[in-house]
Structures are given as structure tokens and as C-alpha cells.
Amino acid sequence: MASQPHLVPDRHGRASSEGRPGHRDRSADGPQKELIERAYRTAEQLGLPVFCQDEAGPYQAIPQPGPAWQPSGVPVRHPHEYVRGGTVKLLTLFRPATGQVWAQPVDHAPNTVLHPWLQDELTAILATLSPTTVPVDAVTTRAAWTIWQEGLSQPFTLPEELPPLRALLVWDNLAGHKTPELVCWLCAHGVMPLYTPLGGSWLNLAESIQRILVRRAIVGQHPTSTNEMKDWLTAIVRGWNAAPTPFEWGGKRAARRQRAHDRRHALGGSGGCTRRPIARRCRRTLSHTIGDHRAN
């Protein structure tokens, strides 16, 4: 779309149109999406763990709608009068390749609560990972970091001295996730943050595991206090980690969709398609048909 349209005037001025910053033909969110998808598909195979972080909630200690296990014909009944028992949020750190979850129910999740919790969890996790024993020069080390900023229009500045890259962290593009103190701490411990684009929280697999945990813990229940909700969430997380399910980005369903898309036949003049090719009459046959019609 042109940044300065010549048609459709707006009163005494020109009509406004949406333009993109810089000299780009594509959305600026594309590189962020591609980096996160590449991390999900290839990083673990290269020995680089990928973690996702998110905060779920707040969830109120009130009767929660949803299905519940009840005898047939005896639905669960919640009181129509109740007292609000406060709210709970769930801090979640998730490793999709193994399915393991580190979670902490809290009353609220400002930076003063989130940052120390995340630092403690990452410190404990990094201590369990195999350390890098092969000496690597500074140029190779920086290249391993900068490859995860490839194509970004506004990448954050990496420190001058970088340790070996040990993990990737996918989380939302929030101001509290970009404080200089936290970003410097992550880089100092070998963790590269990957931020989801605006409106791209669906790229964070922590959203999926949180939905599963919360649905199992409180949907269809009637918690009366925040402590009760915290106990339920903690128990569900403990049960999940007893037999975790690994997550895979895309998977067989995405491959089937891609094969179905490849089998389609695009139509000219629109974005439509057909599932089988349309028979086209050759030019020679068409000319003979027109000639015969004129002769008759």
C-alpha cells in the first residue's frame, strides 16, 4: 500500500494509510517468528536446550465454570452466593523437548517476584546441564549468539564479553522482560532470550502447558481460598512431572496440512484454489470450434 495515496481525500488533506517502518516489503514480526520456530525445531538437536516462560492468570477463588466428573444425571451444583477468596497467578517455566515444568503459584507477579524466581530456577537448571569443556574463541562464541538475532529490526545489544551459549528462553515481549538488569543476567549465564512478536503469544508453548494444568486443577471446581488453589496447582504440576509429555512444534498435523496445501491448485485472479486441476481447452481446438460455428 502506498504511504502517500493520491485518491480518496480526507476533507482538506490526504487520506491516511497504514505504512511499515523502514524499507521493508514484509511484516517486521516475520524474523521473530522464524527464529522461535527454528529454535523449536533445531536447537535441541544441536545440544541447545529451549525453555518457555509465561505467567498464567489471575484466577479467582470463586466457583469455576467447566466440566466435572459427576454421576450421570447428577450435575455438580455451585452456590449462587459466594465470597471472593482472592486471586492466584502461576509462574511457569517449561522445556518442550522433555515436557518438564517448573511452576510456582503466587498471589501476584510483579518484576520483584518474577525475576528472582526465574533466576533461581534457571540457576538450578543450568547447574544440571553438562558444562562446555571445549575451548571456543570469542569470535565463534559471539557468532553463536548473534545467529539468534538474525533479521531482527531492533535487536538488543549483546555484552562485550559473552560466555558460551547454553540455553534459549522464549517468552512474551513485555517491558518487564526487557529490563537491562535481567537481560544482562541472562546473557551472563549463557541464556539467550527470544521475544515473541506483538500478538504472537501463540508462539510460546508455555501457553499450552498452562492451559492444560489450569484446566486439570480448577476448571469445574469451587476453590474457597487462594491457599486451596495453590495446593491444587502444585499437586497438578507434581503429577504432570511424574510422567511428562514432550511437546513438538508443528508435528504430524502440520505436515499433513502442508501436504494438503501442496496438492491444491491455485486459481488466477483471487486467493482461491481447487483440489483438482481444471481441464483447459487448447487454443487449436478452440479455433476449430469457432470456425465450424461460423461456417454453419
Regions found by a protein language model. Name each.
Residues 30-131, 139-145, 256, 260:
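Extended, low-complexity cationic-aromatic segments
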Residues 1-23, 49, 55-58:
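Conserved short alpha-helical interface segments
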Residues 101, 192, 206-228, 239-241:
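Active-site proximal helix-loop segment of RNase H-like, two-metal nucleases, encompassing DDE(D)
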Residues 179-187:
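Short, aromatic/basic amphipathic alpha-helical patches
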Residues 76-82, 188-205, 221-223:
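RNase H-like polynucleotidyl transferase catalytic core
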Residues 25, 231-296:
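C-terminal domain-tail junction helix/linker
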Residues 131-152, 164-177:
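Acidic/histidine-rich, metal-coordinating catalytic segments
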Residues 51-53, 167-172, 194-197, 248-251:
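Short beta-strand segments
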